[in-house]
């Protein structure tokens, strides 16, 4: 029961900066599982051999996974807490002008796709004008 409470507390905390790593790992495992199931389904005459090998592999892999599955999550939480501490230290020591500059850079980056879209939409009209200038009024 105490383990369930610890698991719920650990899941509730979440990762502040490295949550994407956990999401990417979940996505990779799901994709690999789907590819494996597809390959197993399409193995044709090799299907009985795949089924025979799959049993012993599961008998070895499942206990190992159950024994060591907490390690990557704990390591990821440790690294995330280290990143949080580093960001806090850096945030305290940076002068305000650097913080303002980084905010301006982020806003410029966020505005870049819209600027590119507007530029791309205006290009066809400009190329027609240039074609008329170079090739005459036809």
Swiss-Prot record:
Keywords: Acetylation, Allergen, Cytoplasm. Induction: Induced by tapping. Not induced by wounding, ethephon or abscisic acid treatment. Induced by ethephon or ethylene. GO terms for cellular component: cytoplasm. It comes from the Eukaryota. It holds the Pfam family REF. Not glycosylated. Its main location: cytoplasm. Localized in all laticifer layers. It is found in: Cytoplasm. InterPro entries: REF. Disulfide bonds: none annotated. The modification N-acetylalanine is found at residue 2. In solution, able to form amyloid fibers and aggregates rich in beta-sheets. Interaction with membrane stabilizes the protein, inhibiting the amyloid state and aggregation. May be part of the rubber biosynthesis machinery. Plays a role in rubber elongation. Belongs to the REF/SRPP family. This is Rubber elongation factor protein. It comes from Hevea brasiliensis (Para rubber tree).
